[in-house]
């Protein structure tokens, strides 16, 4: 998560609370967005895009699992002059972690694991990680499923901390064996369960648990148990399927007047369970509908309940550990989701930043409202922060009935 955007994310979460507060004992689901309000959102969106040098992006308001309003900007492919549109596929980076978390809770609800189980039951290789406190029983044996989900395990943040930045290097380790070979050269950074510390590899280990229990590769399990029943048929990980390639956005890196095209596809390797998700905004709207249980038709609501119980989702959003100064926009980490309490309401969400793509997912579960912001550009100089905050304010205000 890039420091330049942290204050912006606080505005998003805070304003979402104000924008969707319901009357007592009644869910408020706005039916339409005032034309003048959405016009101001699009103006702010374009002001940020110009200030930050964004090549392409989308802002989307979601109600009851469907897109209520959207605004697309710029190009999905600069060289080919291909515009962003309804079908454009973005990379959602760390928002992927929420899928892995949902999958783990599915297995818990089926009685196949417990949140306080030791992870080394399925991933014994973790015992090779150095314990600087020299406990008689390695500290890795005290890491639980719950700790991995809530980023409180003591494991490091980056999956591969030794990159030299050479163009020929793989983007990330590509095989489980490579990750295992690294373990004796890593250490725990704090006592497991004692505090918060964001960890990308923790979600790779959760995926390993899923694979050991089910026998399915992580991506196959997600396809069968989340995307298919939720009608998210254009979501995928890894290389873009041929039939979707015309819709895939490129990623871009901007530094001053210099723009680098990072291409459409890249290999996230072993990190797919923490950052591999690619999808159009329509699929993300369906995902918000699942999280909130708010689709208009009863058949969809029933199908969503078969994916994961409402009570389990609420459990996932409950705070487990307070975040630290590195994550000021959220007060707490839950089980795969971050949360902020404001005016008695809980806002949940996750963000992503990888390979030129930035993504923002924020949801008010009580009202069923959500906001999605997606960009295909990283600005190495953090330009446009003030404009981004103004955009967030207007976008969230548009949720009001």
Where do the language-model regions lie?
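Sec/Tat signal peptide C-region and signal peptidase I cleavage site
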Residues: 21-24
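Active-site SXXK
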Residues: 39-48, 59, 65, 89-116, ...
């Amino acid at each position: 998560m890039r420091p330049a955007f942290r204050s912006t994310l606080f505005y998003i979460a805070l304003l979402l609370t104000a924008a969707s507060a319901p009357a007592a004992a009644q869910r408020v689901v706005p039916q339409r967005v005032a034309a003048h309000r959405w016009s101001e959102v699009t103006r702010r969106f374009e002001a940020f895009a110009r200030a930050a040098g964004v090549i392409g992006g989308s802002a989307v308001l979601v109600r009851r699992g469907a897109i209520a309003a959207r605004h697309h900007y710029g190009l999905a492919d600069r060289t080919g002059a291909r515009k962003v549109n309804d079908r454009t596929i973005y990379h959602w980076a760390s928002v992927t972690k929420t899928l892995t978390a949902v999958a783990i809770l599915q297995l818990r609800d089926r009685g196949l694991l417990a949140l306080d189980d030791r992870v080394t039951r399925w991933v014994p290789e973790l015992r090779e990680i150095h314990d600087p406190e020299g406990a008689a029983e390695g500290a890795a044996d005290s890491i639980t499923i719950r700790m991995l989900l809530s980023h409180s395990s003591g494991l490091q943040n980056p999956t591969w901390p030794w990159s030299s930045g050479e163009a020929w290097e793989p983007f990330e380790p590509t095989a489980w064996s490579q990750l295992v070979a690294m373990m004796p050269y890593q250490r725990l950074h704090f006592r497991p369960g004692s505090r918060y510390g964001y960890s990308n590899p923790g979600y790779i280990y959760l995926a390993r648990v899923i694979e050991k229990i089910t026998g399915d590769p992580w991506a196959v399990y997600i396809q069968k148990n989340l995307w298919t029943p939720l009608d998210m048929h254009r979501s995928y990980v890894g290389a873009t399927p041929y039939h979707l390639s015309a819709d895939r956005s490129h990623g871009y890196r901007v530094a001053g007047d210099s723009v680098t095209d990072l291409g459409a596809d890249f290999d996230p390797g072993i990190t797919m369970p923490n950052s591999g998700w690619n999808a159009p905004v329509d699929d993300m709207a369906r995902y918000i509908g699942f999280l909130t249980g708010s689709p208009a038709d009863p058949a969809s609501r029933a199908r969503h309940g078969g994916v994961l119980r409402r009570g389990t989702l609420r459990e996932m959003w409950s705070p487990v550990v307070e975040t630290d100064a590195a994550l000021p926009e959220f007060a707490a980490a839950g089980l795969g989701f971050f949360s902020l309490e404001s005016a008695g309401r809980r806002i949940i969400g996750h963000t992503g930043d990888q390979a030129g793509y930035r993504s923002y997912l924020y949801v008010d579960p009580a009202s069923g409202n959500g906001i999605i912001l997606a960009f295909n550009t990283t600005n190495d100089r953090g330009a446009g922060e003030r404009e981004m905050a103004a955009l967030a304010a207007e976008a969230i205000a548009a949720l009001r009935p």
